[in-house]
A protein has these predicted regions:
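C-terminal catalytic/substrate-binding lobe primarily of soluble NAD(P)-dependent oxidoreductases
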Residues: 1-189
């Protein structure tokens, strides 16, 4: 995705997924590469570029604890056989998880930002209900559509990302969806 002003050769500027297993000292978590990181990183890079926040370093991974929790959901319900809706192990294109699994899913994202000189930092947590690959994503897209239709979006034109087009408007909508039960945003530090 085009990121105006991005210098991909700059040593201090990387926007990518984790390339291996690691312990993240800032988040105090063991993690592994996340399969969506290459796509997410491009959108983050474009958002940062359009808002004039480059150069920066952005990395993304998934905690081992989150993977174990997901595995427990599968195992504890007998891979869906106990609830009458088996989980497809090799789903076809467009086939998502069964409804019970979409409802049982959730997500928790922690974002840690630090200035280059490490004098300032912030830790933010975003939690949401529903499988992030299907149920939660469809709700988020619905809120994007409603925000574009009903709320005041950015007056900027061109190819924008959700963050640059809607920013605080979208965050407010997501926090208020389902009477505040869908997504929660918290500053932890």
């Amino acid at each position: 995705v085009l990121a105006p002003g991005a210098d991909r050769s700059h040593d201090g500027e990387t926007v990518a997924g984790w390339d291996s297993r690691r312990f993240d000292p800032d988040l105090r978590r063991f993690g592994v590469p996340f399969f969506m990181a290459p796509i997410n990183a491009r959108l983050v890079r474009r958002s940062l570029a359009l808002d004039g926040h480059l150069p920066c370093t952005y990395e993304e991974g998934v905690s081992v604890a989150a993977l174990l929790k997901a595995a427990w959901i599968y195992i504890s319900r007998g891979f869906g056989y106990f609830v009458g809706a088996p989980i497809p192990m090799q789903p076809t294109s467009g086939e998502g998880p069964p409804p019970w699994l979409q409802r049982a899913g959730s997500f928790c994202v922690r974002v840690h930002a630090t200035t280059e000189d490490r004098t300032k930092s912030a830790l933010v947590e975003v939690r949401g209900a529903g499988d992030p690959g299907y149920l939660a994503t469809s709700k988020m897209l619905s809120e994007v559509g409603l925000a574009l239709l009903l709320d005041e979006a950015s007056p900027r034109g061109g190819v924008l990302t959700p963050a640059t087009a809607l920013g605080p408007v979208l965050r407010r909508r997501l926090a208020e969806a389902e009477e505040g039960r869908f997504m929660q945003f918290r500053v932890l530090d």
